[in-house]
Structures are given as structure tokens and as C-alpha cells.
Amino acid sequence: MVGDARPSGVRAGGCRGAVGSRTSSRALRPPLPPLSSLFVLFLAAPCAWAAGYKTCPKVKPDMLNVHLVPHTHDDVGWLKTVDQYFYGIYNNIQPAGVQYILDSVISSLLANPTRRFIYVEIAFFSRWWRQQTNATQKIVRELVRQGRLEFANGGWVMNDEATTHYGAIIDQMTLGLRFLEETFGSDGRPRVAWHIDPFGHSREQASLFAQMGFDGFFFGRLDYQDKKVRKKTLQMEQVWRASTSLKPPTADLFTSVLPNMYNPPEGLCWDMLCADKPVVEDTRSPEYNAKELVRYFLKLATDQGKLYRTKHTVMTMGSDFQYENANTWFKNLDKLIQLVNAQQRANGIRVNVLYSTPACYLWELNKANLSWSVKKDDFFPYADGPYMFWTGYFSSRPALKRYERLSYNFLQVCNQLEALAGPAANVGPYGSGDSAPLNEAMAVLQHHDAVSGTSRQHVANDYARQLSEGWRPCEVLMSNALAHLSGLKEDFAFCRKLNISICPLTQTAERFQVIVYNPLGRKVDWMVRLPVSKHVYLVKDPGGKIVPSDVVTIPSSDSQELLFSALVPAVGFSIYSVSQMPNQRPQKSWSRDLVIQNEYLRARFDPNTGLLMELENLEQNLLLPVRQAFYWYNASTGNNLSSQASGAYIFRPNQNKPLFVSHWAQTHLVKASLVQEVHQNFSAWCSQVVRLYPRQRHLELEWTVGPIPVGDGWGKEVISRFDTALATRGLFYTDSNGREILERRRNYRPTWKLNQTEPVAGNYYPVNSRIYITDGNMQLTVLTDRSQGGSSLRDGSLELMVHRRLLKDDARGVGEPLNKEGSGLWVRGRHLVLLDKKETAAARHRLQAEMEVLAPQVVLAQGGGARYRLEKAPRTQFSGLRRELPPSVRLLTLARWGPETLLLRLEHQFAVGEDSGRNLSSPVTLDLTNLFSAFTITNLRETTLAANQLLAYASRLQWTTDTGPTPHPSPSRPVSATITLQPMEIRTFLASVQWEEDG
């Protein structure tokens, strides 16, 4: 997508002298001796990374060097589906065929050895690659080796940064970079991150890129006010210090703002989709324009060069789906380069033009040996003009956002079971199981027009289709793995509609089994809820003991749900058996007071309005009056200030004060031994269940919104708002991609003086997992089950946007309003509300947020299945760990990497100074020896975050900052398998393993 209107340290260069031979394609797998006692091998190779710049073109140090970067920006779905874009179908919607782009580019590169091109989207490139002949693949490998075809970024997609979870970002980057490593070796390893189109940039994204080994980061979009200031102060390029916990330069990343977003300069677009005049150098032609073009280009280059600090400037030569006829581009660029450079001798012009790449441009900046300013916040929210804040997409298509988050959860369970069961997961009694389709579908969903909700409706439908089709082979894999690990061949069932209380097996069977798998590194006590048809059931735990259970009636539908608490070990499962008992009349609990409570929390509701009015933490003796209700903003369709309307990208209400969905709610109180609920009905299209389970330290709000009525001609943007008397001084806090927390201040930006044109939309920020407010004593935190937009628009208040339905397009290229066909879309979701003392709040919200993202997975079976192995007794409980992980450590990744290799990531999930009461912010030491029960680790190699290079061989360019020298790590030393995790540190390993014979 193109255009803001979507149309047309240590001293720099510490390793610059090392330009020796490239590392071979086997760099990730150097020969290691067998390990009698397990250890991790660290080798110091501080200059290996600089070798990758040896193919860069020569520059002229005494001139202004203009780096022309030919590129195409190929959205992995937007106006057309992924397949439609790749094959060039429906060009009446948008003329775009990626397969033809790559065909044409390769041909044009071969025609002139000085030409260069960068490619980004590996989802497309890998598909194209598989269709090529061996001869073509050999040619492409040589182009890559010579640096004429270079990959930037290297992820499966160019992911969104506002609505993505860090675990899914890491996964999609790993998928793309692994393809490049296995296909081209280190020759194809990208050196720069390239996010030219995402609509704002998160600090966590920069941190992840730095930990993946990138030398720099280029992007196109930033707030128009921010860009204006940066141009004046020569801060279009700086070092982004992207973590407050990781020691510099671990999360430091050199960052460059491209001068023209990612488009060619005006008048210099020579794609077949453009209308600019080609270069006519024949003086005899009446269309001769070469002299004027050269004059124009020299002025353009000189003016642009004044905005940057070195004798180098970059021009992006390409845009959306360009280069389908690459010759039109390259032929004119060849002429431009020749004509401009001829002026050096003819007229003494001090401008040198060359084909280049972002990495080669970065290399020259590094050699300039300058000191750079440091940025510590992020680039949200993004506005491309007054009244034009791109904060609507934080909440657009909430159903797809939830499906993506559920699929991430499901994929991690699938990956873990594949790792625990080994080859038995892939081939077993249920067929061929495979995690790859869901892994690829999830990677596609991270694209900046997918989970963001900014594609057309039929494309959003196709994204959902890809996820659904990816689940199926994972279900087969999980069935094989569970049979192998449990010793029972059951007819496993996966009820995908449990969120709307539909599961045929539990609603019809007299007896069934419930297998609960826990992907967390510690045991969980988790409430199982299943739709049933009777009122009395007997539930037995894995040891055959009867456990308490309840059947509650859902007032809105008069259906029943069975509840029981399941205790599930770390990275393992428990099997519970359920059987019907003779029916009894359900006992109703009556209470005049609208109060629900357990041993930790009490929630009171206003008897006159039915709204939540008070929350009390009984454990910490905290009482907070809090009112929660639903409101809606009337979506702007344009006014006398601006024609800008609310749309898929843009949030713009036509007034600052939202309207009540209802001032009161009809209520129904449900009290049972295992749950207490207040059912609130606000309107025909908005309801909520406020719920408390025993031993639960948070209040659960399960909301249902939609279909949003628009018969009155008004688009509506629905929020859930919490109002308190907390003195919050204009401050609130949001997560960055589900990881570190950033402080937000109303009507304020840390690096420039804000002219606020939209008091509501201009204060919205992305919320991936949590938002909170605090007065320094008490903290009110709300956890989300998907990405949403959120804010605190007045002191003591906190709001989250849960749904939007709009009647007008926002003129950013989609060309259709965010208005699902038919009656509209109804959406269900959850907010978890925590009230804590500030010093203990992090311990609560960190661990609860982890459980939300990696929730237990329920698998059902009829029971009575045959034994998997006749000689082995079945087991009804299993843990993949011999000992639990400490609470501050998260098992981020456990997945198959090769026939006898696993990918393992361990993460410290607390920030520095975040928790002092339980020392959860302290470093944690783990012994990986015999940690896992299903396999033995025989060899361990530590890698960078995306697992595409050994950490021992990874080296990044070094930069000097205005904050002073940054000490770089000393050469690594061999250490034992006992590893230490610092706060917010993620360590990644490739583990050679041997599976236990009996699983």
C-alpha cells in the first residue's frame, strides 16, 4: 500500500575492515564434538557480520552519493487475496501479479551487472522459488551471492507493529529467515529490517529486530508533525534504544526514516503503472527531456541531502506491486545514472548516483563515524495529517483479531506436542500430522493488512480460511501425539465453537473424557466450561477421584454449561472423565444484593442501574469505587474542519463525548459453588457476564457486542469504559506487543510539541495484552484477549474499543467501509480486571497475561479407546518437564526444527524493577540438563532470536550515541548448560535430542 492517501557505544565501524569470505551455508551447523557433559559453545567472531558488506558498490567520498534502491512492496493480501496477488488474478481490482514481478526482475538484473534489487516478502518469494527450474534457481543464487539481488527484512511478511503479539512476530520472522538461510546460506541473510508500510512503529519491534541481529531499521511512516521536526533538527536517523531492561547495545537499533515514505520522488516513477515521462536523451526528439530531468534530479538530491547528516542519501525507486515490467524501470534508471554522473566531469557537479541497497547505504553511514541521538519511546500513534489519526485499526475486525490470537495459542500447543512426541506426532493412527500449514497461515496473519483488520472483506474471509485449514493438520498431529503420550487411541474431538457454547459430543454423550493440555511451564488450576444437555454430571480426576462440579444455566439461552476445575501439570495434560447422573431439578440461588465474591475479590453492582460500582481486593484490603459501562462514538463522515471520515485505518469520532449504549442494565444473578455471575443486558445488541471463580484474583468480564445497528445512518465505535476516582495525573500505561510497558501521557509526545487536533483519537494507543492506570498506591489493570485500541481520556478513566461498524471509507485505499455484509457481525470477548497495590501488580498481570496467551487447550473423546501399545499401561496425566519453571520464566518456544532437533526459547517475562515483593524481576538461573521428561538434550547451540545464525558468529555494526560510549560484550566463553536469564531476556537454542522410547 502506498502513499499517505494510499494511492499512486563504541566507535563506529569496529569491524569495518573485515571483508573476508562469506560464511558458508552450513554456518548454522558448525561441527561440534559430542558432549559427554552438556554445554553451550560460545566462539568469538566479532567481525563476521561485516563481511556481508563486501559486495556493496563503490562510492565517491568527496561527493553527495545518491543511493537508488529499486524495490517492490508486495502486500501479502489487501485488496486481493494472497493467491490473487501472486497469480495476478482480478487485475480489475488492482493490477498486480507477484510471479511476473519476480520473473521480470531476474531477467532485468541479468541484463546489466550494476543493477540491484531488494525483495522482502518471503511468503511470495518462497512460492515463486518452488516453481522455478534448477537452472533458474542457480542463476538466482548467483545473483544473491553477488549482492545484486538482496533480501531485506526477510520475514514471511512485513508484519504489523500495533496489533501483533511478540511471540507471533518472532515466529513469522523465524519462518522467513529460515527459508533464506536454508536456500542461500549466509549470502541471503538480511542485514537490515525494512518496515516501509506499517502504520506506526512499536518499541518492542525494534528490540526484537536488534536481538535478531539486524544492523539497522528503515521505515516510511511516521507522524507528520514528528517528521517535520526531524527534518529541521537533522534527526531523520538515530539510534533507537528499544528496551529499558536489556543492557545496551542489546536492544539498540540504528533507525532511518525514508525521505519519501517508500515511493519514488515525484516525476521519477517509471513503472508501467505510472504516468511519468520516461527519460528521452535523444536531442533530436521533440520529446527530449534529459537536460531538464538532470537539473530536476540534482536539485532534488541536493535538497534531500540537506535533511540528513552524511554525504549519502537514499531514494526508493519502486512502490506497490511495481516492476511487473522491470525493464521500464531499469532502462530509465540506467539512463538517469549515466546522465547525472556525466555531469561530474562536464560541469564539476558533486553528486554521484548509484544502484544500491538499504544495507549498503547503512554501511556508508556506519563508516561516517558520527555520534547519533537516541530515541527511547515509540512511534505511536501515527497521523498523516490534522484530524487523521491511524488509531482505528487497533480495533478493526475484532473477530479476526481474536481468531489470530486463538490460533497462536493453538499453534504453540501443536508445536509443543510435536516436540514432546517426536516422529510419532507426524505419522500415527490418525494420519499425517503437520504443524507447517498453521505456522505459515499464522505468519501470513501477521501482515500489516491482515491482523490489523485493514483488508477488504473477502480478503479477511480468506485469512480466516487459511487459519481454519491450518488447524486441521495440527488436530491430526495433536491426536497422534496425545495417543502416543497417553497410551490410548481415542476418537479425539476438537470443539472449535466452545466460545458460543456449542460442542456436539458433550451435548449428546452420556459419558466422555476431557483432556486438558497446559502449555505453560508451571501447573495450572483452570476452570473447564462445557456445553451440556443435562443438569447433573459426575466428574473424576486423573486418579479416579470425584471432583466438585456444577451445571449452570445460561439465562440468555436457557442452555447449560458444566463447570469443573482441572489441575494440569506443566507442559502436560490431565484426563478427566465425565458421566451423566440422574436428573435433578436445578437449584436456583436467589439474592437481593447484587454482589459476587470469593476469598480474594468482591464486586458490587448498583441495584438501581445494574452497573458495576465497586471492586474490593480482600487480600490486600483495597477498595475502589469503579463504574463500568458500554458507550459508543458516533463515527465522523467528515465535517467543516476536514473531510476525513472514520474507517478501517482512521478513528475519528464526530464528537469527543461518547454516548451510552444504555444507562442501565437488566441483571440476573447466578450463584453456584464453582462460579458467581452477574448477567447484564444493556440492549438488544450489547450484553455482558461479570464472573468470579473460586481462587481467582481477577474479575472476568465476558462481553458480547453486535450486530451493531446502523439503521439510523450512524456508524458506531463501541467502547467499554471504567471510571474511578484515581488521581492519575494524565498518565496511563500500555504494553508494547505484549511485552514491555510504556508510559503514555494525554495530549503529549515525548520528542516534539504536539498540536492535538483529535482529543480522542489522538490519545488512543495499541493495547495487545494490558492497559492500566495507577495513583501510585492502587493500580487498576485490564487484560485483553486480543489487540484493541485503548486510552485514558480523563484522570481515573480507562477505555478499550471492542467493536466498530462504519458506513464510509476513510480514503486510504481499501475502498469499502468497515461494514460486514448482511446484518453485521457479533463479537464475544473477555476483559480481566485486576486491582492491586502498585508494587505487587506486575506479578499479577504478568502471570495472568501469560495464561491468557497460552491458555490450556481442551480436547474431547468418547472414552473406551484401545491401548496405543499393548505392553504399556495408559496414563491419565503427563508432564513434559521434570521440574516446573520459575514463575518469571516463560517457555516461549518448544518446536520441532529437524528430524532430531528442537527449537527452544526461554524468556524472562519481567522487566527490571517491576516486582520487588517476590523478586520476580531478579535474574533467574536454570539448569537445562534433564529439564524435559520426553527427550534428552544431547547437544545445545545458542542462536540469535530468529535462529538463523549461531550467536557465537553473530556480530552487529557498532554505533556511537550522544549518551556516551556503549560497552560491547566481551568475547564469549564456554559455559555449562546452566543458563541465566536477565530481566526481559530471551535466549534461543537449537537442541539435538533423543526421544524416550515410551514417550
UniProtKB/Swiss-Prot annotation:
Catalytic reaction list: Hydrolysis of terminal, non-reducing alpha-D-mannose residues in alpha-D-mannosides
Keyword vocabulary terms for this entry: Disease variant, Disulfide bond, Glycoprotein, Glycosidase, Hydrolase, Lysosome, Metal-binding, Signal, Zinc, Zymogen
Disulfide bonds: 269-274, 495-503
EC number of this enzyme: 3.2.1.24
Gene3D superfamilies per UniProt: 2.60.40.1360, Glycoside hydrolase 38, N terminal domain, Glycoside hydrolase family 38, central domain, Golgi alpha-mannosidase II, Golgi alpha-mannosidase II, domain 4
Keyword Metal-binding: yes
Cofactor: Zn(2+)
Chain sites annotated for binding Zn(2+): 73, 75, 197, 448
Residue positions with a glycan: 134, 369, 499, 634, 640, 681, 755, 919
Active site per UniProt: 197 (nucleophile)
Signal peptide interval: 1-50
Textual note on the cofactor: Binds 1 zinc ion per subunit.
Effect noted on mutating residue 321 to L: In AM; Angus cattle
GO CC field: lysosome
Segments for region (Disordered): 1-25
InterPro entries attached to this UniProt entry: Gal_mutarotase_sf_dom (IPR011013), GH38_C (IPR041147), Glyco_hydro/deAcase_b/a-brl (IPR011330), Glyco_hydro_38_C (IPR011682), Glyco_hydro_38_cen (IPR015341), Glyco_hydro_38_cen_sf (IPR037094), Glyco_hydro_38_N (IPR000602), Glyco_hydro_38_N_sf (IPR027291)
Compartments, as annotated in UniProt: Lysosome
Major location category of this protein: other
Mod. after translation: Processed into 5 peptides of 35/38 kDa (A), 11/13 kDa (B) and 22 kDa (C), 38 kDa (D) and 13/15 kDa (E). The A, B and C peptides are disulfide-linked into a 67 kDa complex. Heavily glycosylated. Some sugar chains are of the high-mannose type.
Family note: Belongs to the glycosyl hydrolase 38 family.
Record's subunit section: Homodimer.
Disorder noted: Defects in MAN2B1 are the cause of lysosomal alpha-mannosidosis (AM). AM is a lysosomal storage disease characterized by accumulation of unbranched oligosaccharide chains. The disease manifests itself by head tremor, aggressive tendency, ataxia, failure to thrive, and early death.
Full protein name: Lysosomal alpha-mannosidase
Protein species of origin: Bos taurus
